[in-house]
Amino acid sequence: MEKRYQQLFKGKRIDFPLATGAASHVSLTYDEKKNPYLLCWTYIYQEKPEFTVPLKGCRIINNITEIGPCIHIITSNEEYQFQCRSKEEFDEMSQFFNMLGYPILGFKNVYVLNKKIGKGSFSTAYIGTNILYGNRVVVKEVDKSKVKESNVYTEIEVLRKVMHKYIIKLISAYEQEGFVYLVLEYLKGGELFEYLNNNGPYTEQVAKKAMKRVLIALEALHSNGVVHRDLKMENLMLENPNDPSSLKIIDFGLASFLNSPSMNMRCGSPGYVAPEILKCASYGTKVDIFSLGVILFNILCGYPPFRGNNVKEIFKKNMRCHISFNTKHWINKSESVKEIILWMCCKNPDDRCTALQALGHQWFLPKLTDMHMTANINELKRNEAIVHKSNDQQDMCKKCKHFNNTQNDDIYNNNNNNNQLDPNKNHKNNYNDYKNYFDTMLKIDDKYSENLIKDKTSMDSISLNKKDYDAYLVHSNEHDTVVLHGKCQTTKNSSSLLSYKCSRRSPPQN
């Protein structure tokens, strides 16, 4: 039987898929200068290749994924990772590239280990340097004899499946000389635990930004069926040493997919573990929310909610789930942050919020004060403006509709009221009033304004009323958009939240 490399040298197509799934077959060809190219096909009988990979001047590296060994080709413009399904297939393809004059590089041909920074039960962590480019990385070294216990292949799978800006990036993974190496991005800011020890508690505003990042990352993990299971201060790192809110989630050594048998395992760190894990009950993604609630408590006051003289005492308090705010550290903290901590740390997981529900809590909604609102409310007088769906800020203002004698809590979407606010016609003053009003709201947070312009955000219809009006700008964390929300006082004792996307469930009390 012909070897795979023999088939390639005869111009035949062989199955050699890209790890991304963008191509399934390759063949070999040469240009007029005899430079070799790989032609990449999505299926074997395709007439024209999807794309070509120039091999002249490339580097070829031996990587691994959770499936097995792979061949990583780095050209001057792109990188391509081809998946091998067995060691025999990898050996054959390695021979092919060697015969072409492109030997396979291993981990030690690409990286050098500089400094040991940590050691766990199954792995050792180093700061390393990429020899080819000079950039710093973090390398996690796992002895192959401990691969099963270390969960390293699940860690690789999780980091490849859920690539997110608030989760540490897996650059590559290798097998060489009895070890598995994970090459990860280097985060300059250090551990959250160290930062808190050196600098003291966070302000509530900084904590809010930090928690939003982590919740967004957790939502990405949970929506992909992944549970971290060991969220703690040491497993959050600062991306930027000058920005304490720039947190990223690291260390997926205990992570699991929801449908995995490993979800029966009892795991976590004392003081951070959800009570359902301690009770040996079934559990899901909400164990991460509990752990993050503990972290939020900790970064605001400088000490954990479940303290004890020994591990047994900590676990006992951890199981009981009683959280107290009766110290001087909590005197000036808002009621809403205490409320969200209690919601995140509910003993019963059915009463505990999800990541998405937490992001919708009022603590994350920046509120306009009377100082921001008074002038514009007076300008609006008896008039109300309606924001209708549009593609960007300019277009949105042009499509703004104007009404008289409307009810405070109505959302208008009917076709009977269609007087356009045209800045060049009779409604010029109303148009300018509204535009100034909206500009004022955008100034609450520069990030929201930037996202609106950059992302050409569409807006939900909403009534803007002068009477007892609270306005909010909310960052929609799923899609990086901006959503405008308003609350109108309809009677003395009630109000209506005028938005399709911001109905909020009141968290239960423990």
Curated annotation (Swiss-Prot):
Q: Where is the Protein kinase domain?
A: 111-364
One GO molecular-function annotation for this sequence? ATP binding
Residue numbers binding ATP = I117, G118, K119, G120, S121, F122, S123, T124, A125, K140
Q: Does the keyword Transport apply?
A: no
Record has Amino-acid biosynthesis as a keyword = no
Q: What do the Gene Ontology cellular component annotations say? A: membrane
Which keywords belong to this entry? Answer: ATP-binding, Kinase, Membrane, Nucleotide-binding, Serine/threonine-protein kinase, Transferase
Q: Known catalysed reaction(s)? A: L-seryl-[protein] + ATP = O-phospho-L-seryl-[protein] + ADP + H(+); L-threonyl-[protein] + ATP = O-phospho-L-threonyl-[protein] + ADP + H(+)
Task: Identify the stretch(es) annotated as Disordered.
Answer: 408-428
Q: Which residues form the active site?
A: D230 (proton acceptor)
The family database entries (PROSITE patterns) matched by this protein are listed as: PROTEIN_KINASE_ATP, PROTEIN_KINASE_DOM, PROTEIN_KINASE_ST
According to its UniProt record, the EC number is 2.7.11.1
User: Which protein family is it in?
Assistant: Belongs to the protein kinase superfamily. Ser/Thr protein kinase family.
Protein name, per record = Probable serine/threonine-protein kinase 2
